[in-house]
Amino acid sequence: MCGIVGAVAQRDVADILVDGLHRLEYRGYDSAGVAVLNEQHHMQIIRRVGKVKALEEAVIGEKVFGGTGIAHTRWATHGEPSEINAHPHRSGKIAVVHNGIIENYEALKVVLQQRGYIFASHTDTEVIAHLVEWELRTAHSLLEAVQKAVVQLRGAYGTVVMNQDDPTRLVVARSGSPLVIGYGIGENFIASDPLALLSVTHRFAYLEEGDVAEITRHAVAIYNQAGEAVTREIHQGNFEQDAADKGVYRHYMQKEIFEQPIAIMNTLAGRIKDGQVNIEAIAPNAADILAKVEHIQIVACGTSYNAGMVARYWFEEIANISCNVEIASEFRYRKFVVQPNSLLITLSQSGETADTLAALRLAKQSGYMAAMTICNVASSSLVRESDFAFMTKAGIEIGVASTKAFTTQLTCLLLLNVAIGRLKGRLSVAQEQQIVQSLQKLPSQIESALVFDKAIEKLSEDFADKQHTLFLGRGEFYPIAMESALKLKEISYIHAEAYAAGELKHGPLALIDSEMPVVVVAPENDLLEKVKSNIEEVRARGGQLYVFADHEAGFEQTVDFKTIVLPRVDAVTAPIFYTVPLQLLSYHIALIKGTDVDQPRNLAKAVTVE
């Protein structure tokens, strides 16, 4: 959600900090700020509401200069978006930036006010600044003051602290919110995402839960929760240099929609061998665990939850294994029964989703045989804390509304289904080879769906004045309808809901009139006749129908509603295929509405707070 960048260098860091914030804009934010400290102990703090560009102009105008600094993009949780609530926050000579939520901030605020501290903002972060300032009065160092302060905090935090009296040092602390140290030569860095630091380093170490670190120009010292000096492995970052380049595309989301054929191809690479799923390529020793699985529990949020809902159909139909899918924020707060030989699967693009991480940590104490994650970021907390990981190969996804991460998650889930089905003897060699062939054809089939971009753009004009939309689907196309409704509401701000088509007469039919667009996913399959009956129910009440189907479904001759007739694809991969034209529909509607497609209001790319 929020973004953090910090630097200690022998050169001016103002440009480094601002560049880092620009690289984190995709995560979502409503305000931004920097604090820069020079060797003459002069600290400059500048904060602005709105885009990082406004902050950049202010930094240039104020001639901000110094070798140590911290910067932040804020997504409001406590206190409205305003300059006074933007980070960095200051207490005396202490400046602080923070990601996360301090759950006991109100109690701490009362104590600090009794000590004479005056609060300038309405944020929870300001208590950290005052706590550190208080502890520094008796501590021997900034490191000791931060260590004493953070043990008083309850909740999630990734925080970076700077002291005006110590202009060549930063102290950072992590609990529940990711932080990564970047190593340079005569300079070192800190950020909430390694992408922020790609212009200055490719050597990274990821802090673990409870770590506190002291960063200077020439050294990094890391201490665990017990205060013991520890080392964290330094990784050589292997990131896409051109991920931030939109190229010929107007938006990152559009670029990422069109990247899906190659993203799926990359996700399949190495995972198929001699016409079968290469189980060892899923994860080393995965076969030993997967062969014993008798139940699947999927936990995820948002788009990833919708991917899990599709996979439930596959697990039960292909692998003949029971599967539950839960929203992570619900799963972690209820009493659940763990089935024997049950595998927990978490799904997340970023691997830092707070509720999903919390659910994983709870589940690991609850008797699951193993915890697996399907994730797009190899260095993420979910990957590090799971027993094994099955990585999507979507590449960096910058648009807040997920596209290629969703379709590559589905690709991994289908591969996993086939692997379990074979290991448990529930899938014949011929059946496995047929599914594998369907997956191998999928990238080129999605390319054929992208050809319909102009036709879908024309269709989107009908939605220019609409405030509501319904999406309908049956079977595994119901969660595809759910995902399509989510995309539309995320980026166009149209109120969109999805229903299992058979539920129409149980309530949603009351909403149908001549002003209500109804989008139906209706390829030819065993449920098509049922879907056609639901379409007739909408037609009879004058609803505006938009049907996405294939030639075999027989909608070409229809004159009283609009259709996008797509090429036929194999049934098993059809849910992935139909996702793509529906993504295009949401994208073009958002363009007509004039919204911020890549950074929709109130939303963040990585939801790192609960």
Swiss-Prot record:
NCBIfam families found in the cross-reference section: glmS, PRK00331.1
Subunit structure: Homodimer.
Domain (SIS): residue spans on this chain: 286-426, 459-600
InterPro entries assigned to the protein according to its UniProt record, in alphabetical order: GATase_2_dom, GFAT, GFAT_N, GlmS/AgaS_SIS, GlmS/FrlB_SIS, Ntn_hydrolases_N, SIS_dom, SIS_dom_sf
Location(s) in or outside the cell: Cytoplasm
Native species: Haemophilus ducreyi (strain 35000HP / ATCC 700724)
One GO-annotated biological process of the protein: protein N-linked glycosylation
EC supergroup of this enzyme: transferase
Active site: 2 (nucleophile), 605 (for fru-6p isomerization activity)
Pfam family, one: GATase_6
Record key words, sorted: Aminotransferase, Cytoplasm, Glutamine amidotransferase, Repeat, Transferase
Catalyzed reaction equations: D-fructose 6-phosphate + L-glutamine = D-glucosamine 6-phosphate + L-glutamate
Every Glutamine amidotransferase type-2 domain range: 2-218
Protein name per Swiss-Prot or TrEMBL: Glutamine--fructose-6-phosphate aminotransferase [isomerizing]
CDD domains hit by this protein: GFAT, SIS_GlmS_GlmD_1, SIS_GlmS_GlmD_2
Alphabetized GO MF terms: carbohydrate derivative binding; glutamine-fructose-6-phosphate transaminase (isomerizing) activity
Keyword Transferase applies: yes
Function: Catalyzes the first step in hexosamine metabolism, converting fructose-6P into glucosamine-6P using glutamine as a nitrogen source.
GO cellular component: cytosol
EC number: 2.6.1.16
PROSITE patterns xref list: GATASE_TYPE_2, SIS
